[in-house]
Swiss-Prot record:
The keyword Transcription regulation does not apply. Together with its co-chaperonin GroES, plays an essential role in assisting protein folding. The GroEL-GroES system forms a nano-cage that allows encapsulation of the non-native substrate proteins and provides a physical environment optimized to promote and accelerate protein folding. The gene is groEL. The keyword Nucleotide-binding applies. HAMAP family: CH60. Belongs to the chaperonin (HSP60) family. InterPro entries: Chaperonin_Cpn60_CS (IPR018370), Cpn60/GroEL (IPR001844), Cpn60/GroEL/TCP-1 (IPR002423), GroEL-like_apical_dom_sf (IPR027409), GROEL-like_equatorial_sf (IPR027413), TCP-1-like_intermed_sf (IPR027410). One of its GO terms (molecular function) is isomerase activity. Its EC number is 5.6.1.7. This is Chaperonin GroEL. PROSITE patterns: CHAPERONINS_CPN60 (PS00296). It is found in: Cytoplasm. Forms a cylinder of 14 subunits composed of two heptameric rings stacked back-to-back. Interacts with the co-chaperonin GroES.
Length: 546
């Protein structure tokens, strides 16, 4: 077992602070409209260039074990803030550094860390209450575009694309980000339900130019059974042939004689049919089939509920205005299911989302919700190089998450001004070391605004003082042009959720660091050098061995 080094009290906290400082110094240069880029060496390939705080934080590993522990804790704050709110990683890092720095000074001078923490927690809760009072709901496309633009580092084109996507598919709709073939950004909106299963045979294709199978006004057979024999589905095929309408088969799988017969009859023009595998796996597949059944007004043919393919009738089939299938995806447009049943299914999924404790399950449930309640929008990001593409795609992902956060909880004025406004309204009657904790938060809360001003080349102290002294709630500093403006009027806004989570996470990690009394870390041992092999030249005589 490796030897361990133990550090106590001020010695431990000072080394932790050094790690926090180094990480914050690297991350904070990216903050604001005039933030700078950070160039990151990769173990292979070209270096990456980014202005994304969490991307910078994730790359940092320090040589000193204790300093690295401090850096890793703050890195975790940046990641958690990004996961929960999609943005605010740099704000959280700058706040954590500011709070830890102020707190360390007071604790070194003799303040009780536990009492200080209690005061910090009370101040944070009060500031968040005031932030909520200062917030307003996002009402229109213009405000959504403003939030997205700021989160995408002032890229107005990305902002307008996200706003347009959200307008078309709704706040519960699926918006995905993909790489474009060229250098231009574009938005594609898929109406209806799309799932990631393509045709089982290219012989089902009806449009050879686009390699798509398009079925107009089709019946839809849904089953969780594997179809291997033609006799299983013969009665249904005869029924759909008499109606003169095409048939889409969605099953666990279709193989052997069944698939061959379908393809041959399709090529002969006897049947207008297409077949795809059911989406998802296991229990999730069953639920997704039920979603499609609800949307199309059909039933899932399943032996679990006593239905077999041989006994199924036309009445069990779903219907839609159109189905488009390519090699990767199937899209059902304008399903003929009852609106009331669809709404009931949506409400059921919402309840499951609220009840689940698994992030993965929540994500999959939200995807199902979006497919039922809205369409699917795809933002295609274009760039001239692979390095630019990665950086731009990261920005679009951040902007998308931040925009969803804004729609969820509302917006506050941006540029770090909302935190200062909220803190100014808080008046707590505390005493002793609790009061010190409260004052630490009040002093550190201006750190984001100061950093934004500093990155733009302005005097941070003067800017922060001017904002603090002005009584107008919407008054703030526009770092892009150096003017003091009405932040809402100028569209300089942040999601409330981003500001709230950044502050909560920053205070949480700072409290942990300030109440740390000992650190235990491994002592790095110098590995012995490899032995010199030059003296083994005499082994050359072994070359004759084959």
């Amino acid at each position: 077992m490796a030897s361990k080094e133990i550090n106590f009290s001020d010695s431990a906290r000072n080394k932790l602070y050094e790690g926090v400082r180094q990480l914050a110094d690297a991350v904070k240069v990216t903050m604001g409209p005039r933030g700078r880029n950070v160039l990151i060496q990769k173990s292979f390939g070209a270096p990456s260039i980014t202005k994304d705080g969490v991307s910078v934080a994730k790359e940092i590993e320090l040589a000193d074990a204790i300093s690295n522990m401090g850096a890793q804790l703050v890195k975790e704050v940046a990641s958690k803030t990004a996961d929960a709110a999609g943005d605010g990683t740099t704000t959280a890092t700058v706040l954590a550094h500011g709070i830890f720095k102020e707190g360390l000074r007071n604790i070194t001078a003799g303040a009780n860390p536990i009492e200080v923490k209690r005061g910090m927690d009370k101040a944070t809760a009060a500031i968040i209450d005031e932030l909520k009072k200062l917030s307003k709901k996002v009402n229109d496309k213009k405000e959504i575009a403003q939030v997205a633009t700021i989160s995408a580092n002032s890229d107005e084109n990305i902002g307008s694309l996200i706003a347009e996507a959200m307008e078309k598919v709704g706040k519960d709709g699926v918006i995905t980000v993909e790489e474009a073939k060229g250098i231009n950004d574009e938005l594609n909106v898929v109406e209806g339900m799309q799932f990631d299963r393509g045709y089982l045979s290219p012989y089902f294709v009806t449009n050879s130019d686009k390699m798509e199978a398009v079925l107009e006004n089709p019946y839809i057979l849904l089953t969780d059974k594997k179809i291997t024999s033609m006799k299983d589905i013969l009665p249904l095929l005869e029924g759909t042939m008499k109606s003169g309408r095409p048939l889409l088969i969605v099953a666990e799988d279709i193989e052997g004689e069944a698939l061959t017969t379908l393809v041959v009859n399709k090529l002969r023009g006897v049947l207008n049919v297409a077949a795809v595998k059911a989406p998802g796996f296991g229990d999730r597949r069953k639920e997704m089939l039920k979603d499609i059944a609800t949307l199309t007004g059909g039933s899932v043919i399943s032996e679990e509920i006593g239905k077999t393919l041989e006994s199924a009738t036309i009445a069990d089939l779903g219907q839609a205005a159109r189905v488009v299938i390519d090699k990767d995806n199937s899209t059902i447009v304008d399903g003929k299911g009852s609106k009331d049943e669809v709404n009931a299914r949506v409400a059921q999924i919402r309840t499951q989302i609220e009840a689940t404790t698994s992030d993965y399950d929540r994500e999959k449930l939200q995807e199902r919700l979006a497919k039922l309640s809205g369409g699917v929008a795809v933002i295609k990001v274009g760039a001239a190089s692979e390095v630019e593409m990665k950086e731009k795609k990261d920005r679009v992902d951040d902007a998308l998450s931040a925009t969803k956060a804004a729609v969820e909880e509302g917006i506050v004025i941006g540029g770090g001004a909302a935190l200062i406004r909220a803190a100014a309204k808080v008046k707590l009657e505390l005493s002793g070391d609790e009061k010190i904790g409260y004052e630490i938060i009040k002093r550190a809360i201006s750190a984001p605004l100061k950093q934004i001003a500093q990155n733009a080349g302005f005097d941070a102290g003067v800017v922060a003082n001017n904002v603090e002294q002005n009584g107008n709630e919407n008054f703030g500093f526009n770092a892009a042009n150096g003017e003091y403006v009405d932040m809402f009027a100028e569209g300089i806004i942040d999601p409330l959720k981003v500001a709230r989570i950044a502050l909560q996470n920053a205070v949480s990690v700072s409290s942990l660091l300030l109440t740390t009394e000992a650190t235990i870390s491994e002592i790095k041992e110098d590995k012995p050098a490899m032995p010199d092999m030059s003296g083994m030249g005499g082994m050359g005589g072994m070359g004759g061995m084959m």
